[in-house]
Every structure is written in C-alpha cells, then in structure tokens.
Design a protein with these regions (language model features):
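Homeobox/homeodomain signature
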Residues: 28, 35-37, 70, 92-95, ...
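Acyl-donor binding region in acyl/amide transferases
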Residues: 42-104, 108
Length: 148
C-alpha cells in the first residue's frame, strides 16, 4: 500500500505536475476517507491507484470514475483510462484491456515459478478480457486480443 511517506516524497519531486489526486470526504467531516491517484499528460488521464478507510456505496465510482472524468472534461483531456482490473468497467462504459507491468523477483526459485506460471495466467486473463468485451452493450473498435 502507498504510505504517507510515499505521498510526501512524491510532493517533493517534479513528477507532481503529472499526478492528480482525488480525495473523498464524508459529508460534514473534513477528513479524507478515500483517494484515487491518477497520472496525466497533455492528452490522457490514467487511473492508477485507489484506496479507502471505509466501505461506502459508490465511493469507488466517485473517486475512480466520476471525479476523474469530470476533471478530464474540465481540463480538455481527450482520453481517460480508468486503470486495471474488474469486469465492472463495462457498466461504466469502458472496455476491458490488458495492462503491462514490470516486476523483478530476487528470489530465484520464486522467479522460476512465476516465469513458468505467467504465460498460463496471461492466457486466462486474455480469455476473460475477450469474454467481457463480447458482453459490452456498445460498439468499439478495439481488435480482439490473441491468445498466442
């Protein structure tokens, strides 16, 4: 999880101009209970991290979809990518798509296990992405993803 020191360090770097934070507060209480972290450039806003202290209906939607979309429109950002995970994205008007990530394992036995397992996991994920996109109630021009 991202710690307070992460945000303190982030605020002291030049990268902060590319970071947008959306915080959520309960009505009448001036205490942050949830937050989403997005990264931006001149044309794109990417949702990348979210967390909350409380489980409140629609808090995730507000912090990760509604507020970032509203901000992107107000700031003339052309594209919004809400981030990885979840077949729930189709209900929000987004297609499922793969996201790349980079990891390094310093434990060699673990590295070996993950290298063996990863192609199988990637195939299962692409199958799930294609199945999800077959159910979206709108047209889109993304090509089908290959399992090879």
């Amino acid at each position: 999880y991202l710690t307070e020191s992460f945000f303190t360090e982030l605020a002291s770097r030049e990268l902060k101009v590319n970071i947008i934070l959306f915080d959520a507060k309960e009505k009448g209480i001036d205490k942050t209970i949830g937050m989403s972290l997005c990264v931006k450039n001149e044309n794109m806003l990417w949702g990348r991290y979210w967390g909350s202290e409380k489980n409140i209906d629609n808090l995730h939607f507000e912090a990760c979809y509604y507020s970032p979309i509203e901000w992107a429109i107000a700031n003339k950002i052309k594209y919004f990518d809400p981030g990885a995970g979840g077949s729930h994205k189709k209900r929000r008007g987004f297609i499922a798509k793969p996201n790349a990530s980079l990891h390094r394992w310093y434990n060699l036995p673990m590295d070996s296990l993950i290298r063996e397992w990863l192609p199988k996991a990637n195939k299962l994920m692409l199958d799930q992405i294609n199945a999800t996109n077959n159910e979206v109630p709108f047209k889109f021009e993304e090509p089908k993803l290959s399992n090879t």
